[in-house]
A protein has these predicted regions:
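Short, histidine-centered active-site or binding-site loop motifs used for metal coordination
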Residues: 122, 458-459
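Long, ordered, helix-rich scaffold segments
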Residues: 1-445, 468, 474, 500, ...
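Flexible loop/turn segments at secondary-structure boundaries
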Residues: 22, 134, 168, 452-453, ...
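Residues at helix-coil transition
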Residues: 290, 447, 456, 482-483
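Active-site phosphate-binding and catalytic loops of NTP-dependent enzymes
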Residues: 488-492
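Gly/Gly-Pro-rich "capping" loops immediately C-terminal to redox-active cysteine motifs
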Residues: 459-484, 494-531
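The canonical Cys-X-X-Cys-His
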Residues: 442-458, 465
Length: 531
């Protein structure tokens, strides 16, 4: 029907006008392609079928088809410039002015039919009301009544998005029901172990903003709802007043203390607590440093108000693979008085050794050297700034030799059992006749020992070693062979994943989604791990 000539379509339309509803719905569905703007005839057919009370066994299926026909007649749903993406499946592509003449009739029919005996039909009826931004108070009450603890979270989301499209004033009971649905959404998702898309917070934030636009008192109602204080609730603070924000933070603190070690900390919660200058709140924040998943976020917040009591945390943060965390820790240590502790100097040395000459990394290397100079009074010729963006083998070796000789016990502790072999290695390197070396034999060892799998080719897990002799000293290269984990650049630090059945995988994450992740291992295997 959609591909018919206009004259043929008009004839078909007149012929099916006296036919059974299913034929009329099918013809109108295909005929939508022949109509610009709102398809009044198709909409009339759809609303007639939706309103009818029939006893046929397939009446629900027919009404579902009619609901879809009504959506098509209204221009269908989809993305539009300037409209939040959360409404892509709930807002018509046609402008509001085109829908206004039919909004009342659509709302009246939906009100008469909703709720039906079929959940799927109810979803489409609600979508119709959302498309025309129904202003019918009865529908708002009916849709809000579906926000109940017994419904699936997907159903809650559907009706929350629907009511966000209804521009009517809310009463106190409606406000509380909306707030309870928002606050309880994450708990439902967690209980059912449902996966959440990486764009979840963005879409939920858009939904919340629209709900608040219809009800300015909703943020406070959310704050006063029992159960408020989970990490997913932080985004609700975006619409809270400045006066309510400290109260909200106190509610999070109470929730954390009540849950104890079971509280699911997140970076957002850490940042929220970091806004407080309260000593007890900061103490609670420091306790989260023991959790690996938020340790970086904790250090970032503590660095904003550098205190000597956190020095050991800043030193530990120097091992982070995050350059942002590393930068904050260096900045905090630079603000604190000079110290000569072994752990701090060797952690700073680790930064100097593992970072490269790229602009951002060299900037951090230079800052680490400046703190070392202040702490030790030594210089060793390391060049900071733009001119220093080269390997600087001699300076790095001098710093390494000085600090390892100054702090031998801490060096052994950090390097582990392999540290005992370093003196022997250094003596052997001195005795080797380097002029008698054979490159071809080296290539054979490089291949046979499996080094090639990680350090050569486009699928390599580690850095390509071509030209490495020009970037590192001979001693450093052999030390890296003996202690391969000593100086690992942040870009090549791997992730260890343990599955529920006890299997362990180690590799670089090359792709991550809501359903799982893909690892590339040192044996050049690409493994997909499902959640």
């Amino acid at each position: 029907v959609a591909r018919m000539a206009e004259a043929a379509w008009r004839r078909i339309r007149s012929l099916v006008a006296r036919r059974r509803p299913r034929a009329r719905v099918a013809a109108a569905w295909g005929g939508r392609a022949h109509v610009e703007g709102v398809d009044r005839d198709g909409l009339a057919v759809a609303l007639e079928v939706l309103s009818a009370k029939r006893s046929e066994s397939d009446v629900v299926g027919l009404k579902l088809e009619a609901a879809r026909l009504a959506e098509l007649a209204l221009g269908d749903v989809g993305p539009a410039k300037g409209r939040a993406a959360v409404f892509d499946g709930y807002a018509a592509l046609l402008p509001a002015a085109a829908l206004s003449p039919v909004s009342g009739e659509v709302s009246r029919v939906v009100d008469a039919v909703f709720p039906s005996a079929d959940p799927e039909l109810d979803i489409e009826l609600a979508r119709l009301a959302a498309m025309v931004s129904s202003a019918r108070p009865q529908l708002l009450s009916k849709f809000l009544a579906r926000l109940d603890q017994g419904f699936h979270p997907v159903s809650d989301l559907h009706f929350l998005i629907t009511v966000a499209r209804i521009p009517l004033q809310r009463n106190s009971a409606q406000r509380k029901r909306t707030a309870a649905a928002l606050v309880g959404l994450q708990a439902k998702i967690d209980r059912m172990s449902l996966n959440q898309d990486s764009n979840w917070d963005d879409r939920l934030g858009e939904l919340y903003a629209a709900l608040c636009a219809n009800d300015k008192q909703l943020p406070r109602a959310v704050l006063e709802t029992p159960g408020f204080g989970l990490p997913s609730h932080v985004l609700f603070l975006q619409r809270m007043s400045r006066e309510d924000r400290p109260r909200a933070r106190a509610t999070f603190v109470a929730a954390i203390r009540k849950a104890g070690e079971d509280y699911p900390w997140s970076g957002e919660v850490v940042r929220l607590l970091g806004e407080s200058g309260d000593a007890q709140t900061l103490k609670l924040l420091r306790s989260a440093h023991e959790r690996v998943d938020v340790r970086g976020s904790v250090v970032l917040e503590l660095a904003r108000r550098t205190q000597g009591v956190d020095r050991k945390r800043f030193v530990a943060g120097l091992q982070s693979s995050s350059l942002a965390v590393l930068s904050s820790c260096l900045g905090a240590l630079a603000k604190l008085p000079a110290a000569r502790g072994a752990r701090e100097q060797l952690a700073l040395l680790s930064v100097v050794r593992r970072l490269g000459p790229a602009a951002q990394e060299h900037g951090l290397r230079s800052r680490a050297v400046l703190v070392l100079r202040r702490n030790t009074g030594k210089r060793f010729g390391f060049v900071t700034g733009e001119k220093g963006r080269v390997a600087q083998q001699t300076a790095v070796a001098a710093w390494t030799d000085h600090l390892e000789r100054t702090y031998p016990e801490e060096t052994k502790r950090l390097l582990g059992a392999a540290a005992a072999s370093l003196p022997v290695l250094r003596k052997r390197l001195v005795a080797v006749d380097w002029d008698g070396g054979d490159v071809s034999r080296g290539k054979q060892v490089f291949t046979k020992r499996g080094c090639v799998g990680c350090h050569q080719g486009r699928r390599a897990l580690g850095p390509d070693l071509a030209g490495s002799a020009g970037r590192f000293s001979r001693a450093d290269l052999f030390t890296a062979i003996v202690l391969p984990n000593r100086d690992v650049s942040p870009r090549y630090q791997t992730t260890v994943v343990q599955t529920s059945d006890g299997r362990v995988y180690n590799g670089l994450i090359v792709y991550q989604s809501v359903d799982g992740l893909t690892l590339r291992t040192g044996t050049n295997r690409t493994i997909r791990l499902e959640k």
